[in-house]
Amino acid sequence: MTRILLLLLRFYQYFISPLLSNNCRFHPTCSEYAKEAISMHGSIKGLWLTFKRIIKCQPFCDGGYDTVPISIKNSKPLNKKI
């Protein structure tokens, strides 16, 4: 499922997105955010994070720099015991 979603996103980025105006209020763009979220968190949680991001894409939100949250189980401890 993850592979299919990433292929659909790539198709969108190469064939559909260039036809639309570039007025995304966030960095990275929503499609880049979706690719990163799905790659990091899997299809279900990645789609949920993407949905929440797209909901924020409206005139009452300032936008700006918004990255995919890091998964706790995928992160490495910052301090090691010696």
Curated annotation (Swiss-Prot):
What kind of membrane protein is this, topologically? Answer: Peripheral membrane protein
UniProt xrefs under InterPro entries? Membr_insert_effic_factor_YidD
The yes or no answer to whether the keyword Membrane is present is yes
Keywords of the record = Cell inner membrane, Cell membrane, Membrane
Compartments it resides in: Cell inner membrane
SMART domains reported in the protein's UniProt record: Haemolytic (SM01234)
- Report the coiled-coil segments: none
Q: Name one GO cellular component term.
A: plasma membrane
Q: Record's superkingdom?
A: Bacteria
What are the cysteine partners in each disulfide bond? Answer: none
Ion transport among keywords: no
Q: Which PANTHER family match?
A: MEMBRANE PROTEIN INSERTION EFFICIENCY FACTOR-RELATED
Q: What does this protein do?
A: Could be involved in insertion of integral membrane proteins into the membrane.
Sequence similarity: Belongs to the UPF0161 family.
Q: What is the protein named? A: Putative membrane protein insertion efficiency factor
